[in-house]
């Protein structure tokens, strides 16, 4: 257990150092300084020199704002969340929206869905339910190296559907490293050292990749999907329900996890090690250390099941009571959160209730503000006439094969998100794709859904996603290895996303991909 705690602490320090070491000496890096100046400069140049005849002044103004915000998001000239507050200042100044209209977007139902999801995830982490779930899954799947690898991927992927992918990977990596350490200590004379090293690398990458892939399973699994839900509602007035997305997302996760497991086990790090010395013993030992399920864990488990059932059945069961429009996914998320604040804990030395307001310190408020900023900007694009104008300009693409457009969008976003924030990428590109769908005459989800899914999938570089940074921080994998393996996982993801969006999603969501929707 000491080894487990030691490695968790070590990884946390490396993870933080990875993102902070370049910012110790100067307030801005060279790239940030360029972005800091370039953003307002593009804003001014657009206002002064860009005046198409068929674009009203308000549209030019919102385009200028968009270029400013996008530049600061990409370069992270200031914190992304701080940049996301710019619409509150700039949109009312241009008489695009009133202050009340802009501010209301930061309190959208979708933001409260994610807020409730965060609170539920923190409750799981506080009472260590996620560790028990992960270890139980690994223990059930089996003891061979192939099954241990699969077990870690399934456990991490499942957790990341409901808790942040960062938290899921941070929990699983120390367990994985402890198993590898045990294998080295118990190594038999006839055990191939190279095989253990290959298994070690495959396990570390498997955990990181599964944390990223699992987020595609539910709307609260990853920020780009919440942004997709919000932008789709904002531009077209239609909802993507929690239940229907799960029917699309979970099979996607299962297929991606399965193919990635096969690739890591039999192609990228092929080895002859069938059983890992001490592996299954250590898993059982850690389960024993957790002891019997505590009262607080049972409460959180019950609340988790209740939340899942309500999200899944809301659309189907509430229709007969004619209150579907009054009970949104965000309503359920906040109801569940309030229950967690009400129910008392037995272990009152640590916490009086299952969740208390100390949880506010752990909530990622910056992500919620980013969502609000994206929705406010989308509203401005729609109200100013910019969306309509963009649609007219993009009509030249009409006649291009929709599948070709989907392929280009998916691959472009997949590699763009390797070097930019996935939330910022989705927030920037989805409004453009909403307009493009009208111009080329296809259903908006045919373009928006693959972009949102691809924005979540970055496997090549440590800066691509927090899970990548964590596994790189373990010291077990080099950037070169991560890039070479991640490139092929990127391509695998692109193929699966394209197939799912083109052939599965229309059936599940009941949409005609060749039928465009009018912009609001």
From Swiss-Prot:
One term under GO cellular component: plasma membrane
Annotated transmembrane regions: 30-50, 55-75, 77-97, 104-124, 160-180, 207-227, 242-262, 298-318, 323-343, 362-382, 399-419, 428-448, 452-472, 491-511
Intracellular or extracellular location(s): Cell membrane
GO molecular function, one term: organic anion transmembrane transporter activity
Keywords: Cell membrane, Ion transport, Membrane, Sodium, Sodium transport, Symport, Transmembrane, Transmembrane helix, Transport
Domain of life of the organism encoding this protein: Bacteria
Pfam families membership: Na_sulph_symp (PF00939)
InterPro entries: SLC13A/DASS
UniProt main location, coarse: membrane
Described function: Mediates the transport of the dicarboxylates fumarate, malate, and succinate across the cytoplasmic membrane via a Na(+)-electrochemical gradient. Transports 2 Na(+) for each dicarboxylate.
Note: The binding of Na(+) at the extracellular surface probably precedes the binding of dicarboxylate, since there is a competitive activation of succinate transport by Na(+) and an uncompetitive nature of succinate on Na(+) affinity.
Family (UniProt): Belongs to the SLC13A/DASS transporter (TC 2.A.47) family. NADC subfamily.
Name of the featured protein: Sodium-dependent dicarboxylate transporter SdcS
Organism name: Staphylococcus aureus (strain Mu50 / ATCC 700699)
């Amino acid at each position: 257990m000491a080894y487990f705690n030691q490695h968790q602490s070590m990884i946390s320090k490396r993870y933080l150092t990875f993102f902070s070491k370049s910012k110790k000496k100067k307030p801005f890096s060279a790239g940030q300084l360029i972005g800091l100046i370039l953003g307002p400069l593009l804003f001014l140049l657009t206002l002064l020199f860009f005046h198409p005849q068929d674009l009203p002044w308000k549209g030019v103004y919102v385009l200028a704002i968009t270029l400013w915000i996008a530049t600061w998001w990409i370069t992270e000239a200031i914190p992304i969340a701080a940049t996301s507050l710019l619409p509150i200042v700039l949109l009312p100044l241009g008489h695009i929206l009133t202050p009340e209209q802009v501010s209301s977007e930061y309190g959208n139902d979708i933001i409260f869905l994610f807020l409730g999801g965060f609170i539920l995830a923190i409750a799981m982490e506080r009472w260590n339910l996620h560790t028990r779930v992960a270890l139980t899954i690994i223990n059930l799947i089996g003891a061979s190296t192939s099954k241990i690898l699969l077990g870690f991927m399934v456990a991490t992927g499942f957790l990341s559907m409901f808790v942040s992918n960062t938290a899921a990977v941070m929990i699983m990596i120390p367990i994985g490293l402890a198993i590898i350490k045990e294998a080295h200590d118990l190594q038999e004379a006839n055990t191939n050292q190279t095989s253990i090293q290959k298994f070690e690398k495959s396990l570390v990458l498997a955990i990181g990749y599964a944390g990223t892939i699992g987020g595609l399973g539910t709307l609260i699994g990853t920020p780009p999907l919440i942004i997709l839900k919000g932008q789709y509602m904002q531009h077209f007035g239609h909802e993507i329900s929690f239940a229907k997305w799960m029917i699309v997302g979970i099979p996607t996760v299962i297929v991606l996890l399965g193919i990635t497991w096969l690739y890591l086990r039999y192609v990228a790090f092929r080895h002859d090690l069938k059983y890992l010395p001490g592996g299954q013993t250590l898993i059982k030992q850690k389960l024993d250390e957790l002891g019997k399920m505590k009262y607080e864990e049972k409460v959180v488990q019950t609340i988790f099941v209740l939340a899942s059932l309500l999200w899944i059945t809301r659309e189907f069961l509430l229709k007969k009571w004619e209150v579907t429009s009054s009970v949104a996914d965000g309503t359920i998320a906040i109801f569940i959160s309030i229950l967690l604040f009400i129910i008392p804990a037995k272990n009152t030395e640590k916490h009086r209730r299952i969740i208390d307001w100390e949880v506010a310190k752990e909530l990622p408020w910056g992500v919620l503000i980013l969502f609000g900023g994206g929705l406010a900007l989308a509203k401005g694009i729609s109200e100013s006439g910019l969306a309509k104008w963009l649609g007219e300009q993009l009509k030249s693409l009409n006649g291009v094969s929709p599948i070709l457009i989907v392929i280009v969008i998916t691959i472009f976003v997949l590699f763009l998100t390797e070097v930019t924030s996935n939330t910022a990428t989705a927030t920037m590109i989805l409004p453009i794709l909403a307009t493009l769908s009208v111009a080329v005459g296809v259903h908006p989800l045919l373009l928006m859904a693959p972009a949102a899914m691809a924005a979540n999938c970055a496997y090549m570089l440590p800066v691509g996603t927090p899970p990548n940074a964590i596994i790189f921080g373990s010291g077990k994998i080099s950037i070169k290895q991560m890039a070479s393996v991640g490139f092929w996982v990127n391509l695998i993801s692109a193929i699966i996303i394209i197939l799912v969006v083109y052939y599965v999603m229309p059936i599940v969501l009941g949409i005609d991909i060749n039928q465009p929707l009018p912009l609001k």
